[in-house]
Amino acid sequence: NAKITERHDLIGLPFIPGSSPVEFLSLSSEPGARLRATVLEFGPVLFSKMLDLNETQQGVITVIFKFCEDHELPLLDLEDLKKVLQYLTTDGKEAFEAEYGKIMTTSTGTIMRKLVELEQQGATEFFGEPSFDVEDLLRVNADGQGIVHALRLTDIQDKPKLFSSFMLQLLAEIYAIFPEEGDVKKPKLVLFIDEAHLIFDNASDALLDQIEVMIKLIRSKGIGIFFVTQNPSDIPDSVLGQLGLKIQHALRAFTAKDRKSIQKAAENFPESPYYKVDQILTELGIGEALVTALNEKGIPTPLVHCYLRAPQSRMDVLEPSEIKALNDRSPLVSKYSEVIDRESAHEILTAKLEDAQLDSHREVIQQQRTRARQEKSTMEKVFSNTTTRQIGRTVARELTRGLLGVLGVKAA
């Protein structure tokens, strides 16, 4: 490509085409290694924030998690949590309230509706086992190359809550598992979150706060995070302020609103005596960007107008046959393809409720049998009485005589 050759001659860097090992991940039925997590792994705090619950409802979720822990009821998928809610508001209500206190049915009703809403976004496929092991993201191939893991989002565009919940859980899992690294020369893992607006669109304030906290904390684990989006206004200011490296490509202004957005984006960069930032943002060409980072002292570097080198890997869409070939030889696809459906809260409580119903049915039958025996015993006593037997014989004899008299026969 003449343009690529021209660019690399200009910046003085060689262009050596090459490929990187790639594996595909998926949150749904799209081809790729299935990503799953259990309700238990989310924990009560993160799970409550995902559902956008108020303080009272969060307390209910916390107590439910505690109840399940105390009674060895694994919370693996949404069906488990729904079954626990059903149990605690029906057969198990009295025992639960005696041990953990009363919970309002309005709170459990709201939680149930939130779970149904989450299910409508495809969360049923996400919650379950086997859980994805985040250390699989650190694998290298036989040549020592790090593997690029691409999460396919082709069918997640209209499910922002599922995507944001997954990303938050992934960050939380990485923070919990990876050791402290402090400042490192290069990160051990870098996450590029494309279409970053999917995380923040319709996200609750509680969820945004949690994301901001995670971004602050995870840097000490040697993890890098890039939010990739067409417009910097897609990222909340609270999150944008946590990012040390900014690479801004051209922005185009077609409306007054666009011009205001560009002005705001320009204000997010360090002041520069060399550039009129809001103007140059609209004049950048293909493969050009404004770049600023943090130096070793944590101070933003001066703003620089850069020419970027062209990607040395393929810049094209993969054919379905190519995706299939990659998945067929992927060890992660085979590792996470089979769903594990072990006994959990749903099965345990279902069996418990069925046993309770069976015991109740047996008790009803026993009561009916007891009542029948009592009625039979009463009748037996009546007919065993001597006076009763005598009256019966007299009545029978008189009836017989009357009948024979009608027939013209004399009784003896």
How would you label these PLM feature ranges?
Residues 1-14, 213-299:
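Conserved ATP-driven motor cores of ASCE-family P-loop NTPases powering translocation/secretion/packaging/pilus
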Residues 1-213, 239, 283-284, 345:
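P-loop NTPase motor domains
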Residues 25-27, 151-154, 192-194, 199, ...:
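Generic beta-strand/beta-sheet core signal
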Residues 29, 155-156, 196-197, 232-233, ...:
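Short, glycine-/Ser/Thr-/acidic-enriched flexible segments
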Residues 33, 51-54, 101, 204, ...:
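Hydrophobic alpha-helical scaffolding
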Residues 34-37, 51, 247, 280-384:
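Conserved P-loop NTPase motor module
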Residues 64-67, 114-121, 169-177, 199, ...:
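Generic, well-ordered alpha-helical scaffold segments in large soluble proteins
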Residues 363-412:
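Long amphipathic alpha-helical segments used for membrane anchoring, targeting, substrate engagement
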